[in-house]
Amino acid sequence: KPILFINKIDKKDYILIDTAGMRKKGKVYENIEKYSLLRSMRAIDRSDICLLVINREEGIIEHDKHIAGYAKDSGKGLIIVVNKWDTVEDKNNDIKDFTKKIRNEFQFVPYAPVVFLSALTKARIHTLMPQVEKVEENIVKEIKTSLLNNCIMEAYDLNPAPSYKGK
């Protein structure tokens, strides 16, 4: 069963669900991996915002993409969190290079912010909550109908429907 944490930050309650981490192939049996993935999917169903934690030492694994895709398909907010940043020596170049790799591997969620931190040393952990608040604002943001209609018309003008026999 996932572990639940209730945090109160700036007078807001946040319920954090910690699911079992995914592992690279060969480290666990396949059926355990599938069960772990199903638990993560159930946790996503119960969430508003998902924090996809990537282990910097292991890098991006296939399950990370499945989880991100499921969060996207479920209409959930998503933040990609790169943990174990304390183990990286060239931090400035690593942020740039690994963010580029994330953007390449997760092209289907270009809107998801990327946060680098270390849970162990608490380095850059202060950068996470502002991103959670920003994603939360975007989830509840309402778009005016006129703006949405204009956007749809622009898209239609750029890609009009094919005509049938010139009509």
How should each PLM-predicted stretch be described?
Residues 1-17, 21, 27-38, 42, ...:
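C-terminal-of-GTPase-core extension/linker across diverse P-loop GTPases
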